[in-house]
UniProtKB/Swiss-Prot annotation:
GO terms for cellular component: host cell nucleus. A motif (Nuclear localization signal) lies at residues 87-89. A motif (Nuclear export signal) lies at residues 106-115. It catalyses: Couples ATP hydrolysis with the unwinding of duplex DNA by translocating in the 3'-5' direction; ATP + H2O = ADP + phosphate + H(+). It is an enzyme of class 5 (isomerase). ATP-dependent DNA 3'-5' helicase required for initiation of viral DNA replication. It forms a complex with the viral E2 protein. The E1-E2 complex binds to the replication origin which contains binding sites for both proteins. During the initial step, a dimer of E1 interacts with a dimer of protein E2 leading to a complex that binds the viral origin of replication with high specificity. Then, a second dimer of E1 displaces the E2 dimer in an ATP-dependent manner to form the E1 tetramer. It comes from Human papillomavirus type 16. This is Replication protein E1. Its main location: host cell. Phosphorylated. ATP binds at G477, A478, A479, N480, T481, G482, K483, S484. Gene3D superfamilies: 3.40.1310.10, P-loop containing nucleotide triphosphate hydrolases (3.40.50.300), Zinc finger, large T-antigen D1 domain (1.10.10.510). Can form hexamers. Interacts with E2 protein; this interaction increases E1 DNA binding specificity. Interacts with host DNA polymerase subunit POLA2. Interacts with host single stranded DNA-binding protein RPA1. Interacts with host TOP1; this interaction stimulates the enzymatic activity of TOP1.
Amino acid sequence: MADPAGTNGEEGTGCNGWFYVEAVVEKKTGDAISDDENENDSDTGEDLVDFIVNDNDYLTQAETETAHALFTAQEAKQHRDAVQVLKRKYLVSPLSDISGCVDNNISPRLKAICIEKQSRAAKRRLFESEDSGYGNTEVETQQMLQVEGRHETETPCSQYSGGSGGGCSQYSSGSGGEGVSERHTICQTPLTNILNVLKTSNAKAAMLAKFKELYGVSFSELVRPFKSNKSTCCDWCIAAFGLTPSIADSIKTLLQQYCLYLHIQSLACSWGMVVLLLVRYKCGKNRETIEKLLSKLLCVSPMCMMIEPPKLRSTAAALYWYKTGISNISEVYGDTPEWIQRQTVLQHSFNDCTFELSQMVQWAYDNDIVDDSEIAYKYAQLADTNSNASAFLKSNSQAKIVKDCATMCRHYKRAEKKQMSMSQWIKYRCDRVDDGGDWKQIVMFLRYQGVEFMSFLTALKRFLQGIPKKNCILLYGAANTGKSLFGMSLMKFLQGSVICFVNSKSHFWLQPLADAKIGMLDDATVPCWNYIDDNLRNALDGNLVSMDVKHRPLVQLKCPPLLITSNINAGTDSRWPYLHNRLVVFTFPNEFPFDENGNPVYELNDKNWKSFFSRTWSRLSLHEDEDKENDGDSLPTFKCVSGQNTNTL
């Protein structure tokens, strides 16, 4: 019967790297037998006499050796043991793989014979717990290797901190007496793995504690927390845990292309390298963007990082960054941020000053800003370049300061406007508008509506002069004829006030006219005309009227020129006969034209109105002051900041 395929599994018959081979003796009957192979001869054992070790001879030989040879042998053994300790400490143990420990101990050749294809591709791990060199770190938490010696002397342990952990070894040696001995104590302590820290209930608290333990300062003392991950900022403070030494050394090179300023500190611990960064990026970034960037560059998990913006107004924090930046424990790249220089450099301390409200009021006046919120926002933006604005931000009464500034600015603006004539006011407004307008756009629009240009100029001249019975112009027409567009464009250019009849139930609905050079009432309806006919006849005449103003007694003033738009021609309607001679009516019968793209055919903007008034200046009888010299400004420059005396040496 044929033998079965394969092997029978008996010892020595498989393909294990070696084989049992039996000797084949070819001998026939009658052949001469060699004396060496005579099986009939008796074995007396005399041929093995030379291989027997005689203990007496060995002891005799040992006694004859010199003391120098014994010392040399013992010293060589001591050196071999010391080298072995270093190898076991710094070289990777062959038993690092737990699953292969048993096979490796039985026979290294068995592991070499493998029919499976092993993958040798390099795998990049975020956290790798390396073997310390003393055997199976995961199995043996504490291994003691002792060699008998005459004295037990311990030396301090040396620690090496790598990617996520390190090892600890103790070496002790001694000499004296009759013999030589040494003791090697190899102590493997349980390592605090960064992954185990992240699995705790409060990983951030553990990282904060470790940071304070290493750097001696609390991380929260250096940063101001951002609750939202979407909040953007250019300056960021970053603490990263569990970095490898090679990456920690290359951070400066990796981040230079992204930042303008870089401050790096790195310390080693049982978690690995802990790096503290102060970074000023080239553009504003949020926390999520920084996490994605650093997790790729530094090969660290976002959970192992604390990212917050630094404290910009803390002198203690600024001094910390300044002192560590000039020491040898930090690497610095780029120019120092201004918020550090402002609090640490002596010259910046000299430049600090107390807040002066007059400077803030002068700034608001020069920029024509009278709104509280706009003043607060725009003046705070000047803190980096304006010392008075910086002092304003340090004040604890910013709201009161802003309110006082806006109030004073409005007072100055109101007084300035009140002392100007209509000609001065139009010139003042023209100086604040760029050139390049076309006055013909306004003329063509009036002709399109059938308004004679010369009659409009005559009415406008009397309107601006405030002549009684000519102090009010009515733009009458159907819907969508451009009445409101024409009137609003003129109000915007002359910075007039607009009132609305919807507020007529209030006693103060006419208050905007008290501080205006020109006013407008848009879309007057029948109730509005009834109210005007009953209460505002003197106002339309341009005479003195009594007006109720908030927080002030009744104010007596002359009503400014008033422009009214309406779908009702009150100048001819029989319901209001007493308004007929008080209104100058212009009718707009045609619908306002637009081109195929939806843009107005006639542009009514500030530039065109400036060109219009400049072109018709003499026809409108607008005269400038005669004392104006060399085309200078007719109005002196307002200055509310007190003068400063020059110190003389």
